[in-house]
Amino acid sequence: SMQLIGKDTLLKIQDLFSRMKTHCATGGSAGNTISALAHLGAAPGFIGKIGTDEYGMFFRKHLQQMKVETRLLECALPSGIASTFISPDGERTFGTYLGAASTLQAEELMPEMFAGYSYLYVEGYLLQNNIHHNSRQTSQCVYNKVIYIYDTSF
């Protein structure tokens, strides 16, 4: 299961995790899709928004190590993070803080960010910002001949 959480809950979880052995990995629907494409030999790019914190830098570094062209905007909010809890029987639940990623607005997307790509895959969480209905973004996709796909699992 997954539960969206606020900053206060995130801080409590981080305090709890600071006393445990943890593992950090990149993820998210779009992040996992881009990682898979890179492993298959494609040359994907990633547009998103991160905080100027250790998680944002970790995410940027991971994408760059995989040769993914990063087009990451930064903001003062913490980076989005999904804190994962796994029970002894393998059941998983996520406490998801969207953070900086949730502030990405269509107005921040420039036509040159789409140049050279054939597909645009939008993370489901960004649908809450109506980023998929923005005429500016749509015109950028049309101008650059980009097919627009979005994750509706949110």
Regions found by a protein language model. Give the residues of each.
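Ribokinase/PfkB-type carbohydrate-kinase core domain
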Residues: 1, 22, 60-75, 79-154
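Charged, low-complexity surface patches
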Residues: 26, 52, 130-131
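A glycine-rich beta-to-alpha transition motif near the start of alpha/beta enzyme domains, typified by
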Residues: 6, 44-70
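Glycine-rich phosphate/adenosyl-contacting loop at the front of the ribokinase-like
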Residues: 1-47
